[in-house]
Amino acid sequence: MQYIKIKGLEKDISRLVFGTATPKLFAAVAPNATKQDEEAAFALLDTVFSAGINTFDCAAHYGEEIMGRWMEARNNRDQCVILTKGAHPNAWRDRVTDYDILSDANDSLKKLKTDKIDIYMLHRDSHKVPVGIIVEALNRLYKEGKIATFGGSNWTYQRIEEANEYATKHNLVPFTVSSPNFGLAEQVSDPWVADAKFSDPCVTISGPEKLADRKWYAETGITVFAYSSLARGFFSGAFSSEKPEEAYKIMDDAGIKGYYCPQNIERLRRCEILAREKGVKVAQVALAWIFSQDMSLCALSSPVTKEQIYDNIEAMELKLSFDEVKWLNLVD
């Protein structure tokens, strides 16, 4: 396992981050959950943790409650890095407000059964809200000792820049992390467009049009926590570029909406070619491509079997040449 450091956090952070929005973990906190459901969730988390993955991605509406129970049962909170998110819109309104930021963070602390969140992110942004209000609210949580570091998920780099300029001007702590979509697959449509009814849409830094975004991250050193790094199963190997229509049987609606397009099918075809040449799996090639980028970067994924977990870890050691990296991304 490879680890990195981020400013403000003493713990090592695994470059593979386990995404907790996965069926076994949802089942464990469902109203009809059984003891067996909890045991299955704990077993998955045990396997992830024993493999060296110590960083877990949660949010106000997934992962927190079961993570809190598991860490309490295993007495390993100090060994885990918890990334969680708040201020996601609901069906009625935008929730990127100082009230909701503070409220969600305090709720998260209770569900996680902890007194401090390692990495706290806002799940969405809203340009209707002055950035100063947001920075002040996050700094209040920081000064109260409730969060160690913070940033934004689905924030543009320009908005992060604005936030950090405000922080510098007012002697406050800046954003040090960001979680946009990033991976080999180009995100061609907002997978959760309904969520953008009140807040800003999802943010991706994938594809040729986002080169300036990636350059900014490389230059600033702000760590990227890349969500949907394998495009919600597009590079799972469960379907091939020869029969791409099989994706409709494998992927959910968000995955199809976000990633099913001719250019990504071609990227999949090229992954398949390299996977055969190197004797590895398609998902490993796609992950290796991510880790070949010139950014401080961690990749979020939600493997559900021991084999998938260790395949992902092995992908970190798979080296791609400069030409292979370009070729996979359709830069011929």
Predicted regions and their residues:
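Short, acidic/polar
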Residues: 33-47, 96-112, 161-165
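N-terminal binding-site loop/beta-alpha segment at the start of enzyme catalytic domains
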Residues: 1-80, 143
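Active-site groove signature of glycoside hydrolases
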Residues: 109-130
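Active-site mouth loops of central-metabolism enzymes
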Residues: 23-39, 86-100, 123, 127-128
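Acidic-and-aromatic substrate-binding clefts and catalytic sites of carbohydrate-active enzymes
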Residues: 57-66, 89-95, 125-130, 157-160, ...
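Beta/alpha (TIM)-barrel catalytic core signal, keyed to glycine-rich beta->alpha loops juxtaposed to Asp/Glu
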Residues: 130-332
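Short catalytic-loop micro-motif centered on adjacent basic/acidic residues
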Residues: 54-59, 121-122, 148-153, 179
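A short, structured active-site edge motif that brings together acidic residues
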Residues: 78-92, 178-182
